Amino acid sequence: LVLDPHDEYYGRTGLGLKDHVERGAVVYYTPVNPPAGARSLKINLSCIKPDHFQGAIQLSDPQRQCLFAYYRKYKKEWIRSILEDKKIEGVAFHEDTIAVVKRRLIGLLGLDVENGVVVGTQGIFDVVAGENTITEICSELERGKTVIVDTSYFAGAIEIMIGTIIVSEMFDKYRYYKRVGKLEDKPVISIVLEEA
């Protein structure tokens, strides 16, 4: 897994892994104008879990508790539920906590919200597209492919979050494989995280 903050590994504008003899083992995800054979980088909001924010943004204990409470109650719809002011029976958060959480989610995820409803997105996070992106990336890594994710358009927090989403999904899969005795059959996955 290569998280590429300079968009240089694939070789969109020059030589790169796309020109390697084993280019069939290279998969490239980019958020803007994917070249032929590349894939568009979109991640559906329903794929995001509260843990994915760790390291990307600082949250107070009440804010973190808010994220986890909404995730436990609303599962894949937890982000929308916060934005739509849905309540959790028997649980109350200070209105300032909810307001800060909303602002942080809207800002970090690039959401356009009107009256609590997501009406559009400005980045890679989406309400319609991207439901299978993380699953596909993980499957390609499991098959031994080199997956390059172009993070050159993002601030550090988003790059960290993208990496966290992918790696946590892979870790969960590999933990399952270990439990059922299939880990030995899986490839070791290396992660290249280059600083910009």
Task: Please report, for each region that a protein language model flagged, where it lies by residue.
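P-loop NTPase motor domains
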Residues: V2-A196
